[in-house]
Amino acid sequence: MTKLDKKSVIGISALLVHAANIDEIYSKHEKDLVKEFIKTYLEKDNADEILKEAEEIENNSNQLLNYTNIIKKNPLEIKKDIIKNLWKVIISDNSIDQYESNLMRRICGLIYFSDKECAEIKLKLLNS
């Protein structure tokens, strides 16, 4: 899989943290999923440090557009993986609330990712 630069991983990780926080419950399991994403793209960096930086960015910003601009620049393969990781974080508590669904619709629209593909990824994860 294509690797991402550190700045992109931090930005996307901040978006994952945002998705985890949107239901106002940020669990250890969700943190672990974000760290798993970080380790996938940045093998040599400390995932805990990257996560902390992403959490700080998320706490100080609510600029969805900044996060999605990072995603938009990547090939379809990477976009699909990011959407998959966002859904993993969202469904990790076995519940999808209206804010989480709305967030995913907005993100997919902003990165020009079809609703159909987004739904297929979600269903695949729910059925696995």
Where do the language-model regions lie?
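Small-residue-enriched hydrophobic alpha-helices in membranes
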Residues: M1-S128
